[in-house]
Amino acid sequence: MRVFVAIEISKTQILENIKKFQENAKIDAKPTRTDQIHFTLQFLGEIDEILCEKIKNALNEISFSEFEISLNGVGGFPNLKNPRVIWIGIEKNGAEKLISLAKKVEMKLISLGFEQDKKFKPHLTVFRVKKRIGDVSSIMKDFETTNFGAEIVSKIKLKKSVLSPKGPEYSDLLEVNAK
């Protein structure tokens, strides 16, 4: 099974604001379904049931306090001149807390053979670009200071991802609440 550790966005107002942004941005890219918007703390890839149980045990040992994040601004990976992903960002304090939580996840899973292959950059993927769409920086300029709302981070999830022609389908394998 293909799995990852995530934080979901659950606040209706934020999801509605993201949906409005996706509709108003008018770019030729595939929007992320709002029921699938999340922060990927760590992608773990294909694993078996035995390793999944070990991962669950490790994640259950993580202790963290809930915290608030404010979602604002937009950007692209690798950049807005030739993006593959369009994302929504997080204000500095919340980003630092997300980075700290991602580090806790990584430290718990490193003994199971999982290590971040690249530095965690807190973002919400809101569009995936399949074909070259060129420079969208002028379109995104209108949204660079948009505030999408604030969310309380109170749980992390181990999620299963099943790929299909219609896109990925996610299901929860484990939920770890803030303590």
Where are each of the predicted segments found?
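Histidine-dependent nucleotide/RNA phosphoesterase domain, centered on the 2H-phosphoesterase fold
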Residues: 1-179
